[in-house]
Amino acid sequence: MFLEVADLKDGLWVWKVVFLQVCIEASGWGAEVRDSCGCGDSSSHQTDDPATALALHVACHSFKGQLVQQTLLLGTRPRVWVNNIPQEGPSLPLRQWLLPQCPSLNRSGSAMGTGWGLSGLSPTALSRDGYETETPFSPEGAFPGGGPAEEEGVPRPRAPPEPPDPGAPRPPPDPGPLPLPGSQEKPTFVVQVSTEQLLMSTGGCDKEPPRGQGVDTRGDRTQEGGEKPREQREGPRPEQGPDIPGQQEESPQQEPSSERGDSVGEREARSPGHEGEGGGEWPGISGERRESPGEWGADVPRGRGEGAGEWGSDVPKDRGEGGREWGPEAAQEHGEAARDWTSESPRTLGEDARDWGSSSRDAAGSSPCALRGSLAPERLGDGPWPAWPSPQEREPGPRDRVESPREWGGTESPRGWEAGPREWGPSPGGRGDGPRRRPRKRRGRKGRMGRQLETTATSASATGGPAEEAGASAPEGQAGGGPRGRARGPRQQARRRHGPQRRRGPPQAGEEGPGDATLVLGLGTTSGEQRADQSQTLPALAGAPTAHAHAVPGPGPAAATLGGRGRRGSWRGGRRGGGAGASGGGRGGRGRGRGGRRGSGLSGTREDAGSPSARRGEQRRRGHGPPAAGAAQVSTRGRRARGQRTGEEAQDGLLPRGRDRLPLRPGDSNQRVERPGHPRGGHGAINAPSAPDASPPHHPRRWVSQQRQRLWRQFRVGGGFPPPPPTRPPPVLLPLLRLTCAGDPGASRPGSRRPARRPRGELTPQRPSPFAPQEEGLRAESCVDDGAIAPDTDTASGEVPEAGPSLSSTMCQMGRPRPSPKSPR
């Protein structure tokens, strides 16, 4: 029971006695508590659950100790764990252990003397309560060496309890409310205690609840799920080891309990896959264990069913039943005594299962169960804890190989169970050799950028025909030839990506590249993978100088264009709209092929000058970076080429400017490319940094203006406001509008003149006569009702002509539905 007491009545301290966990093994307590409680408020204690009663009582007494003394310490030596230290009733003065747990100086200043030891607990001096300091329990008083509390009023200074040792294993997490004790003998209120406590408290199994339950087959345990395991947890601790009769005896194989890894840490470390339980406990997984029928027996059902059959008959029952549960024992139980579970993965076990199978224990099956109880809840299959992949799932490795869970995946899979053997990482060989590998992210300068250095002339060839024709001069090609400014080194060039994005290189001369320029360019990719990987490389690679993103691709290490962001490498609009245009603004982002949609006043001629439509020769970029090869549009000749391979033109903006283009910034383009910093020192283009703080502003106000300018530039480049929605001729909109106003989209006649028909059963004022003829619904009526209704139409339809302008559609909404005959349905 956790008793949490916040301000005790006169307590200076708000302390949580979270630790007064009272585990009562005797049953008569409810009554005793009620009787011994003098608080008159016995109704509050009127619960038959002794632990609860005790807690209530204690709370109601502000821990005056009467109760605890009379009750806790009464005849049955209840176990009380305080602060997780199991103590047995009167054998130890409560004060000695309660006190340290609850630091509280009582207000009166007396240390509450040697009151039977709750002195630490009760803010009220015990001596005032009539429990004088001489109590049978400890003449020493709460403070060893202290004698009775010092003169009243002078509390002996007490050090606050030391915080729990961080290294010490924590008590296993509380598994939550115990399920009703199913087959268990009456639940002893067991609280989980950490292994240490158990070690301390139970040297042996003497205090254990009869382990008879140990034999419970798993079924029992599972239904009790939390409780029994808890009990068991409390109970046969592995320390108890074989000596727990019911428990170990059966399994000769059982390892020495010590190995049992019972210390929580050890137990926890064990990979959950501990041996058997894999499948059952982690029901989700069909493991290899399960898979190799031979091993587990062909039939091995997946479920946690009882008995060996579960694992297949050949599996000895022990595995079937309990072993499967991951009792720590079970885990160890296969012969190796000290297998270190942490290092061993279930797979290993998986293989061993056969060995385990041999354990005799299986006959009883019980011990695994019992064990299971003692396992930390993580292992319990039933608990709320997520199942770990079952060991079964792993293919058995050689038995002794120690492997870490990392390896559980296919045996060779470096990445763990998620990936099949070859799933990631470069595969040594050609195309078909494995499941599609994700392109390996290159990290660090050796990855994408460093390569530029190695490629020299090759890059010119690499950048390949179109690139060259696009004016990449070779030197620059080497610097920025690849669209990301990484020259495609010879190796990279060949690197094939089977994914949608084929290569980031400029399209080879004859080759038709992947459809979307963004992919080709490595601009945005759906996964963001490339971009991520570029940005990973950035800082590392670019080195400080280019760290603010305006680095232009250049051969030097500095040349790492950040992530190859294009020359003037700012995210400008995300590489001009790179992936979705940064904030939608990229030039590409706004789909401006041909500038057609730039529907803003800004369109002006800027558009021809700089928009992608102003292609190639006339590239008067007016100082704005390379034309966008945007995600949405790399417009090659002003046509949106979305998804279409837009040949080199798509990229030529990204290719180094050479021959016919004016350099981006005054100065020799190649030279500038090589020295990526801002030409005049200072920051790069204002919008250069991809992250706002990439180039820290030097002046607070400057930052604002930079931002403003950056936003504005994005806006301009991205084409200003999105074009207003096309205006539709009103006749088209009105009927729609009108229907919705009428509130009944199904109304047959859109006219606003009559409110839409309401569903049949609804009460609405109806003019009983004359019903409009049925065909009225079909009658075509002009959608736009100019107000006056031609009476002849109405009379034709049998409707009484109404004078006055018909309500406009809005009026329908405004609640003045005009009464009108409803045609009968």
Curated annotation (Swiss-Prot):
Primary subcellular site in the record, as a coarse category: nucleus
GO CC terms, sorted: nucleus
Comp. bias intervals (Basic and acidic residues): 217-237, 257-277, 315-342, 392-406
Expression sites by tissue: Expressed in neurons.
Extent of Pro residues compositional bias: 157-180, 721-733
Biased composition (Polar residues): 191-200, 524-536
Bias-annotated ranges (Basic residues): 437-449, 485-505, 565-575
Keyword Nucleus among record annotations: yes
Keywords recorded for this protein, A-Z: DNA-binding, Nucleus
Bias (Low complexity): 247-256, 455-477, 537-562, 734-750
Biased composition (Gly residues): 576-588
Subcellular location(s) per record: Nucleus
Function: Might have DNA-binding ability.
PANTHER family, alphabetized: SERINE/THREONINE-PROTEIN KINASE LMTK1 (PTHR24417), SERINE_THREONINE-PROTEIN KINASE LMTK3 (PTHR24417:SF2)
Protein name as it appears in the record: 5E5 antigen
